[in-house]
């Protein structure tokens, strides 16, 4: 299944049905009075988190969604039927944004969560509603309320406990494949990983979700390489595991390149707990390894872990360090709902 983490869609809730102007016509009943029924209510547009989804690919092929209109009222005090709701299914971690792509409307973080994005219009009153002691035969009725329409953006931010960051070919996908059942594409060229990957890691009986995103290069925030758009998938992570390739030219510069891109994307990412690891230590000589470790230590201002995803050296220790942070960090993500307007009702005229 193709991965799509952003989609623009048009939604419209159903219009309310019109009220009816009608009078009783039964034989032998003089001055039968009004009998026009009310219109039915329009259907709502509802967004629901569904199990088994991990992409927004369905919204590439269909972008317009309209709920059903309410039917009109009829004579003999018959009210119109309500329109059917339309439900859009999204994966957990999806955010609803306004058309400006900045205003957050709602953030889905729980399976089964539902949010009414657009309420259907109320049905209009039929003339029977307006009957009074001074107006025995009203000849007016309300039209139904129009439904709401808008363009929105759906943006998926994967929910993971820990995230892997680093330059291309730092060994992120290899590490994910070793510590979990995930099978990301692995090859000896940059940008092998084109889409985020998730894996469930088990360490000493404790499980957590680890996310691997495409590598960052200098200028990613300006669109270089694959850009920095995939960093949104590690925004929810509680801890970042920053991998630096021991075979690169200068480990310290490689570390700073990624940190600068994290800062350019969103300062909050640099505030997250970071564990630094020098990877591929089995591929360099001891003297070179010491130089790279010292360079990385000076740049990161902390002692890096020494690991090898291929050989398995130090991997367990790195995972235990992640688990220690994940166990301490509080849950900070809370769903944010848009303020609901007061329900509309037809006006007495």
From Swiss-Prot:
Q: Which InterPro entries match?
A: G_OBG, GTP-bd, GTP-bd_Obg/CgtA, GTP1-OBG_CS, GTP1_OBG_dom, GTP1_OBG_dom_sf, OBG_GTPase, P-loop_NTPase
Boundaries of every Obg domain copy = 1-159
What CDD domains does this protein map onto?
Answer: Obg (cd01898)
Q: What is its EC number?
A: 3.6.5.-
Keywords of this protein's UniProt record, alphabetized?
Cytoplasm, GTP-binding, Hydrolase, Magnesium, Metal-binding, Nucleotide-binding
Q: How is this protein annotated for GO cellular component? A: cytoplasm
Q: What class of enzyme is it?
A: hydrolase
Question: In terms of one coarse class, where is the protein primarily found?
Answer: cytoplasm
Span-the-membrane segments of this chain are none
Instruction: From the Swiss-Prot or TrEMBL record, state where the protein is found.
Output: Cytoplasm
State the Gene Ontology terms under molecular function: GTP binding; GTPase activity; magnesium ion binding
Q: Which cofactor does it need?
A: Mg(2+)
GO annotation (BP), single: ribosome biogenesis
**Residue ranges of the OBG-type G domain?**
160-327
Annotated binding of GTP, by residue: 166-173, 191-195, 212-215, 279-282, 308-310
Annotated residues that bind Mg(2+) are located at 173, 193
**What family is reported?**
Belongs to the TRAFAC class OBG-HflX-like GTPase superfamily. OBG GTPase family.
How it assembles, according to the record, is:
Monomer.
> Could you tell me what this protein does?
An essential GTPase which binds GTP, GDP and possibly (p)ppGpp with moderate affinity, with high nucleotide exchange rates and a fairly low GTP hydrolysis rate. Plays a role in control of the cell cycle, stress response, ribosome biogenesis and in those bacteria that undergo differentiation, in morphogenesis control.
Record-given protein name: GTPase Obg
Source organism (scientific name): Rhodopseudomonas palustris (strain BisB18)
